[in-house]
């Protein structure tokens, strides 16, 4: 696909459009009396607590996903919350859920999926809210965690290298752009792979980071750059991907284990070795720059994909 057409396709993808839908919320929250030491726009709300931080996050599942694949929706609701906690250098403590279904029978696969993921990641589900007399089926999950040190999305620095860490040992969902490298994986390996992120945080190996979300690697890059008030040049030809997935679809995919890290050049080798030791791909895909633009380049040339002086994404970088 031509670079200009690829850029247009990505900008019109639901993953990025949904991130822009956050703008009214970011504008509203900027007028509230949030404590000055809590940055709005990270993967979790990080609240100073003693010698560390409490981490709080929540995720809602897409209604059609809940309807069409309830077991995997239940699993994913836990998995994405766990990922948010680890992405910030923390470890999960407990989960609560809000589950609405049309009857008790329809709630069972959602509960089974959540339970399976909670066992795999060893995070207890400790309560929540349930309604099995609803006119529709819906699920959201919230999580509490704790970190000694943080990996925030607010501290990328010009000159940093952008690393994409991803587990390519998976498969694409038959209907949704989800790269599943989790449900058939040994839970011990799942947890050990995620433990890399507290290690990165506690050894100051990473300036900033985010987990790759529904916006794909490009949308996630935009979110990190917006909150850090930086830009970047990303080389599309270096982005790791499975050979069986078309590149445009891959760029819009949400991996079960995918992270974007902003790392000082002197620490890149050490960070990559940590992932390599776990057989996880960790590739240098670009550089953070001091111009507020995301520039995509390939063998075809380059294009300004996003100019933050002209257009916000979530709006959080504008209010932080």
Where would I find each of the regions flagged by the language model?
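Short, compositionally biased
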Residues: 174-189
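Acidic, Ser/Thr/Pro-rich beta/coil linker or hinge segments at domain junctions
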Residues: 2-3, 21, 278-320
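Extreme N-terminal cap/leader segments of soluble proteins
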Residues: 1-66, 88, 97, 108, ...
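Glycine-rich anion-binding loops of enzyme active sites
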Residues: 53-56, 61-63, 91-176, 287, ...
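Beta-strand->loop->alpha-helix junctions that form or flank phosphate-binding loops
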Residues: 36-39, 131, 212, 230-242, ...
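Helix N-cap motif at beta-to-alpha junctions
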Residues: 262-269
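Active-site-proximal betaalpha loop/short-helix elements
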Residues: 187-256
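Small-aliphatic-rich amphipathic alpha-helix that forms the alpha element of a beta-alpha
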Residues: 69-96, 109-120, 195-201, 217-223
